[in-house]
Amino acid sequence: MFTQYVVVKLKAKAAPEFTRLIEREVIPMLRKQKGFLDEITFISPDLTEAVGNSFWETKADAEAYNRTAYAEVMKCLATVVVGTPTVGTANVSNSTFHKIAAAQTA
């Protein structure tokens, strides 16, 4: 399993709309992508920053999403996000939620 995380700065008072857009616009787009498994989104306590973690079957699936749908997702969020997102990737080594063990990624 592979994950991509995106860190964004939120516009003032935009957290509720950000959450709505993730639920109603972004997650349906992600579900259409090959290899998509899950999305978990966090918002900082002061409501100024959000982190989205998308989970993919393979690194290739995440890379394909980046080439095809990532720009559309960010366009959808343009009304609530400021600045350039920080993007990173990682192999998932453990997850109680997804029931995987480190041996599966070794």
Where in the sequence are the language-model features?
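Short S/T/G/P-rich N-terminal loop/turn motif that feeds into the first structured element of a domain
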Residues: 1-51, 55-71, 79-106
